[in-house]
Curated annotation (Swiss-Prot):
Molecular function (Gene Ontology), one example: DNA binding
GO biological process, one term: nucleotide-excision repair
UVR domain segment(s): 211-246
Organism of this sequence: Prochlorococcus marinus (strain NATL2A)
Subunit structure: Interacts with UvrB in an incision complex.
Name listed for the protein in its UniProt record: UvrABC system protein C
UniProt xrefs under PANTHER family: UVRABC SYSTEM PROTEIN C, UVRC/OXIDOREDUCTASE
GIY-YIG domain residues: 22-101
Predominant cellular place of this UniProt entry's protein: cytoplasm
Family recorded in the similarity comment: Belongs to the UvrC family.
Subcellular location: Cytoplasm
Job of this protein: The UvrABC repair system catalyzes the recognition and processing of DNA lesions. UvrC both incises the 5' and 3' sides of the lesion. The N-terminal half is responsible for the 3' incision and the C-terminal half is responsible for the 5' incision.
Keywords: Cytoplasm, DNA damage, DNA excision, DNA repair, Excision nuclease, SOS response
């Protein structure tokens, strides 16, 4: 049974608030469907939780929206505030509650990921964390992308590591093994344990433990030399030289090179803050990490503390430095210091330098944070100009925050697909992209109908909203956040503007589909024709008068081109799969199920063609007789 939000159930709220203990601990706020919205901690739970529901207490719009959805609050009492901090950090890390996300990793900043859950882990750059892969280890986010790529490239030259996600050949190693770049993991030429030991040494570089790594490699080199294994000793020597080259350009910028420090500073402007972390190890700058934060309801001390809690809860204890220099005094400086010391099992000091060389370093980090802030502000300003101009072109009431664009791709009706791309605040939001296979039986090889295809896609996209309205739901109230069911109904993806790639015909078919859904009065929809870059709006014959180079048109073209790229990529993928299947369809005795098994097992026609008889016959669900037919089809001169 779904619970009613507490603010609409005064009796239940009053009873709950009376019984809250005034002990330290954590509180977990949940919605009506028991989804976790927010995790918080407090030295006095009663005072903190009551503050959310106290009349006259001015809450930020974000927190106010959250409180309207809270239907249940779970309390966990701890012995002290330090335990509450540790528990809060673990809960946020495990559940990633929506309203806890104060920090935003800029998607331009990449991480280094090591997939420790794999038998032979990979190491690669990524801009997105894989939430379901709990054994993955991430380092970053790094600000200097070019330097990071160069570092990883050099590391893969120094240490033989897995180079490919999918093996190039099924039955033999590739050239990377022959030239010493890969230890032959595809054929298991190296044990998983030995390979992971190599990767642990690479991990030490990203942990800032290069001094330890040097000592380890020097001992190994001496051991190889004493055992007369001169080739192995030479390989380790090359690794040592390579590690030195990685950091030879770094300057000694702190007097005491024996101390490991992280320096954290920020720059703020309007409602956004840029936060930078400089990682100093043995006097060398080994990494620059960056975050962006919404600072509309938080002061500098709160943001810096949130950075520290967020960052150090995601690293191994060995990566926590003995000293952290911060730009401003933290809200709970002693508490955070004790928390980090407990994790590291060694004293961690958090200091605010006022003078001397340390203060100069803080100024340097602040300067870099400000440069990143100006970069992101320039991008936002450009997007705002484009969105504002588009609003004027289309005579919209408000600037469109979420814009969706749709395109159809096919060749004479074959492999017909559609794309949905989404721009939020003028920036591509790839996590919201969708692809559609056209299901209409009328669309087939030799017969295409872009109008019908587009109508089908729009109908499928908005049928949840149509059902909500048919059941008596008020879309306008929902979108204005006057209803607490916004997330509960999973109706949080309403676009402010829909753009159709096409002319008046495509637009008319979409409008007809929306009329059938009874959504035509709620949705802003336009089309952009390719030939003359004309913009059409519903029920108006003539295109709008625009200039090709005005900002709003540039945004529309960028959106349209992205939709076209996404659609044609999916179409080519589907066509390639069909062509593979069509070749296998020519083999007697192979039905759809066995073709699917073959492609899943061997991944390509080429691999099936090169497979030996024993490999084919051992494929699950195939059998010896079918393996004979396949082998004879591809190698008629060597009939079995």
């Amino acid at each position: 049974m779904e619970l009613t939000p507490l603010i609409r159930d005064k009796s239940r709220l009053s009873d709950f608030l009376k019984d809250i203990p005034n002990d330290p601990g954590c509180y977990l706020m949940k919605d009506g469907e028991d989804r976790l919205l927010y995790v918080g901690k407090s030295k006095k739970l009663r005072n903190r939780v009551r503050s959310y529901f106290r009349s006259g207490n001015e809450l930020s719009p974000r927190i106010s929206l959250m409180v309207r959805q809270v239907a249940d609050i779970e309390l966990i009492v701890t012995d002290n505030e330090s335990e509450a901090l540790t528990l809060e950090s673990n809960l946020i890390k495990s559940h990633q509650p929506y309203f806890n996300v104060l920090l935003k990793d800029d998607k331009k900043y990449p991480y280094v990921c090591i997939t420790w859950g794999d038998k032979y882990p990979r190491i690669f750059l990524t801009r997105k964390r894989r939430q379901r892969q709990l054994k993955d280890k991430y380092y970053g986010p790094y600000v200097d992308v070019y330097l990071l790529r160069q570092t990883l490239f050099s590391i893969k030259k120094l240490f033989p590591l897995r180079q490919r996600r999918i093996p190039l050949y099924k039955d033999r190693t590739c050239l990377n093994y022959s030239i010493g770049r890969c230890p032959g993991v595809c054929q298991e030429e190296i044990s998983s344990e030995d390979y992971k030991n190599t990767l642990k040494r690479v991990e030490m570089i990203f942990q800032g433990r290069t001094d330890e790594l040097r000592i380890l490699l020097e001992k190994q080199m001496i051991s190889f030399s004493e055992s007369l294994k001169f080739e192995e000793a030479g390989s380790v020597r090359d690794q040592l030289k390579g590690i030195d080259r990685l950091y030879e350009s770094q300057k000694m910028i702190i007097p005491d090179s024996s101390v490991c420090r992280d320096i954290i500073a920020m720059a703020s402007e309007e409602n956004i803050s840029s936060v930078q972390i400089f990682q100093m190890r043995s006097g060398k700058l080994i990494g620059r990490l960056g975050y962006f934060s919404d600072n509309s309801n938080f002061n500098s001390s709160q943001i810096l503390q949130q950075v520290i809690e967020n960052h150090y809860s995601n690293v191994d204890p060995v990566e926590i430095p003995s000293e952290i220099l911060v730009q401003h005094q933290l809200v709970n400086n002693i508490l955070i210091s004790d928390w980090l010391s407990e994790i590291k099992k060694q004293k961690v000091n958090i200091n605010v330098p006022k003078r001397s060389r340390k203060a100069e370093i803080i100024k340097l980090v602040e300067k870099n944070a400000n440069l990143e802030l100006q970069r992101i502000k320039q991008s936002q300003d450009k997007n705002l100009v484009e969105l504002d101009d588009l609003t004027n072109i289309l005579d919209l009431e408000n600037i469109p925050k979420r814009i969706e664009c749709y395109d159809i791709s096919h060749i004479q009706g074959s492999d017909a697909v559609a794309s949905q791309v989404v721009f939020i605040d003028g920036i591509a939001a790839r996590q919201h992209y969708r692809r559609y296979k056209i299901k209409s039986p009328n669309i087939k090889i030799g017969h295409s109908d872009d109008f019908e295809s587009m109508a089908e896609v729009i109908t499928r996209r908005f049928r949840r909203w149509a059902r909500f309205k048919e059941e008596g739901g008020d879309i306008d109230a929902l979108l204005s956040n006057e209803s607490s069911v916004l997330d509960n109904l999973n109706l949080n993806d309403w676009p402010d503007l829909v753009v159709i790639d096409g002319g008046k015909g495509q637009l008319s078919s979409v409008v007809a589909a929306l009329e059938g859904l009874k959504l035509d009065q709620n949705l802003n929809v336009i089309s952009l024709a390719k030939k003359k870059e004309e913009v059409f709006i519903p029920k108006v014959k003539q295109s709008l008068v625009t200039e090709s180079n005005q900002p709003g048109m540039l945004l529309l073209r960028r959106l349209r081109d992205e939709a076209h790229r996404f659609a044609i990529t999916f179409h080519r993928q589907k066509r390639s799969q069909r062509m593979k299947r069509s070749q296998l369809n020519e083999i007697p005795g192979l039905g759809p199920q066995r073709i699917k098994l073959l492609l899943e097992h061997f991944r390509s026609i080429e691999a099936i063609q090169m497979a030996t008889f024993s490999e084919l016959s051992s494929t699950p669900g195939l059998g010896r007789s079918t393996a004979v037919v396949i082998r004879n089809y591809f190698h008629p001169d060597k009939n079995i």
